[in-house]
Design a protein with these regions (language model features):
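Positively charged n-region of N-terminal signal peptides that target proteins for export
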Residues: 1-3
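Expand to "…catalyze enediolate/carbanion chemistry for C-C bond making/breaking, isomerization
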Residues: 17-274
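Bacterial N-terminal signal peptides
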Residues: 5-14
């Protein structure tokens, strides 16, 4: 009887009426200081190489395929360039299929505030969660004030955000700093409350620095240091060659893509003792 009571209690705290987990497993990894590994949701309409970009397509079937791979802790759906609410639902539904190998968190990157304005961004944050996302990323945050505004969108969405001040949260809020002026404010932004992940967009930062990869790496390390000081997660892209280095440095969310993604994640898991 005691075992049945315990089991019911666990189920009631981890599963919603729709069957969607209330607390992504990656949060439990982060709580014990273990890194999580994820993959970009691939565009299912990429087309042959050399023919230029096509409109991105994301389907439930694509989500189901990702769900069956036990290596992935999370899936990162990049809608920064072209927001598509239907794509969020399609991938979320696919990730929750009965064939899924564990619960993979879905983190959605939406367009930056500067692109379509605060009202559109606020609406998209709520819409993404309503469609089944576990987390939302707001890229190109330019200042402390804009970071405060972005964090407010998660409050407006009534998301129970996991953060250093709220370890019982079940949703993920992520901010990205991608230009030198924003990175210079990393300490002040890290000191803000109400969000989960602070990351540096290393590629965008390098571009903003005129292609200076060393400068972008230095900026990335600055953001990492501030994130770790504030007990925030930091996310970064990686590959098989630098997996061990990034794990050792303390990045708790590592993201990859492409044909070599599984090999990169295997290398990362091995380095992390997973």
């Amino acid at each position: 009887m005691r075992w049945m009571t315990f089991a019911i209690a666990i189920l009631s705290t981890t599963v919603s009426p729709s069957g969607q987990s209330q607390r992504p497993a990656i949060i439990d990894l982060w709580t014990i200081g273990k890194p999580a590994f994820g993959i970009y949701a691939p565009n299912e309409n990429a087309g042959p190489r050399g023919q230029g970009p096509r409109p991105a397509v994301y389907t439930r079937e694509g989500g189901e395929k990702l769900a069956m791979n036990p290596l992935y802790d999370f899936v990162f759906l990049n809608l920064e360039g072209s927001y598509d609410g239907a794509a969020i639902k399609a991938i979320a539904d696919g990730l929750r299929s009965i064939s899924a190998a564990g619960h993979k968190a879905l983190i959605v990157r939406i367009p930056p505030i500067e692109k379509d304005g605060a009202d559109a961004t606020r609406t998209r944050v709520k819409e993404a969660f309503d469609a089944g996302a576990d987390g939302v990323t707001i890229p190109h945050v330019r200042s402390v004030d804009e970071a405060k505004q972005a964090i407010g969108f998660f409050r407006d969405a009534r998301a129970n955000v996991w953060s250093p001040a709220n370890r019982t949260g079940d949703r993920i809020a992520m901010l990205m700093l991608e230009d030198p002026a924003a990175v210079a404010q990393a300490r002040e932004i890290a000191d803000l409350t109400g969000y989960s992940i602070l990351a540096c967009g290393i590629g965008s930062l390098a571009q903003a620095l005129g292609g200076d990869r060393e400068g972008a790496e230095a900026g990335t390390q600055k953001v990492l240091a501030e994130a770790r000081r504030a007990k925030l997660v930091d996310m970064l892209t990686f590959n098989a060659q630098d997996a061990g280095k990034r794990v050792k440095e303390g990045f708790l969310a590592l993201l990859t893509q492409g044909a070599a993604a599984d090999d990169a994640i295997r290398a990362g898991r091995a380095a992390a003792g997973r």
